[in-house]
Regions:
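Proline-aspartate-enriched helix->loop->beta-strand connector
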Residues: 22-28, 44, 150, 154-158
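Solvent-exposed loop/turn segments at secondary-structure junctions
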Residues: 12, 25, 32-34, 51-54, ...
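Short, solvent-exposed loop/beta-turn-alpha elements that line the ligand-binding surface or hinge
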Residues: 1-10, 133-141, 186, 203-204
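A short, structured surface patch at a secondary-structure boundary
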Residues: 1-20, 31
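Ligand-binding pocket segment of bilobal, Venus flytrap-like solute-binding proteins
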Residues: 140-165
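Alpha-helical, coiled-coil/dimerization segments enriched in small aliphatic residues
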Residues: 113-143
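Structured C-terminal subdomain patch of bacterial secreted/periplasmic proteins
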Residues: 156-223
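Extracytoplasmic substrate-binding proteins
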Residues: 35, 42-108, 192, 201-223
């Protein structure tokens, strides 16, 4: 769209393009955090990335700050209240059913598992799923696992983020998971492998609309 200026990609910012816009304020997310000093040379800069390990508290802080910044405090509070109500409803359903989950990312044929202390902590800490594996390495990129992992760690749900759907690389996660080993698992037999909207879960977490969609996806899965 011609009305928007291209200022780079998710990983590489075109600082000359940013400077040409002569901004009064620059708001960045987690992917640009390491370049914050370069942004500050252009204009005052704030990092409003949401912390996945403490998603809701971080989300509320960010939305509240944005409400103050743009004189939309009432709208910000309303959005937070509505999302908290939705989370409480899903959390209640999940807890009543005693559901467990594994959260994984498919990336060019590899599978990585993520814990409650990871970027996908909302599923555990907010929406109430119990971790089936409490010994996952909490690195940024998760812990690489094989499909046999799901035979040993039997969760009620497996939530899959397909990085390849965002980057355009690798086989689709749904095809990757359709294999002899995975098809032996109860989670596959029960139809509880859930392929999440990867654009949102991988690149757009933290927004009001994206958070609503994230919660709705999980709510639909556990109806």
């Amino acid at each position: 769209d011609d009305k928007y200026t291209n200022v780079g990609s998710l990983k590489e910012t075109d600082f000359e393009a940013v400077e040409s816009l002569n901004p009064d304020l620059i708001i960045i997310g987690g992917r640009q955090a390491e370049d914050i000093d370069s942004f500050k040379e252009i204009a005052p800069t704030v990092n409003l990335a949401v912390d996945g390990q403490d998603y809701m508290n971080s989300f509320k802080t960010v939305v509240t700050d944005l409400g103050k910044l743009f004189d939309k405090e009432d709208e910000a509070k309303k959005a937070i209240d509505e999302i908290e109500a939705k989370i409480e409803k899903v959390n209640k359903t999940v807890k009543e059913k005693g559901l467990t989950a594994s959260v994984v990312m498919a990336n060019e044929g590899n599978i990585s598992a993520f814990s409650a202390k990871s970027r996908y902590g909302l599923i555990y800490n907010g929406l109430g799923f119990a971790e089936v594996d409490k010994n996952i390495d909490d690195s940024t990129h998760g812990q690489q696992v094989s499909f046999e992992y799901f035979l040993e760690n039997k969760s009620d749900y497996v939530f899959v983020v397909d990085r390849g759907a965002v980057t355009g690389k690798g086989e689709a996660a749904s095809k990757l998971f359709d294999n002899e080993v995975m098809n032996k698992t109860e989670v596959a037999k029960n139809g509880n492998i859930v392929y999440l909207n990867s654009v949102i879960w991988y690149t757009m977490t933290g927004g009001i609309e994206s958070t609503n969609q994230m919660i709705d996806e999980i709510a639909d899965a556990v109806k």
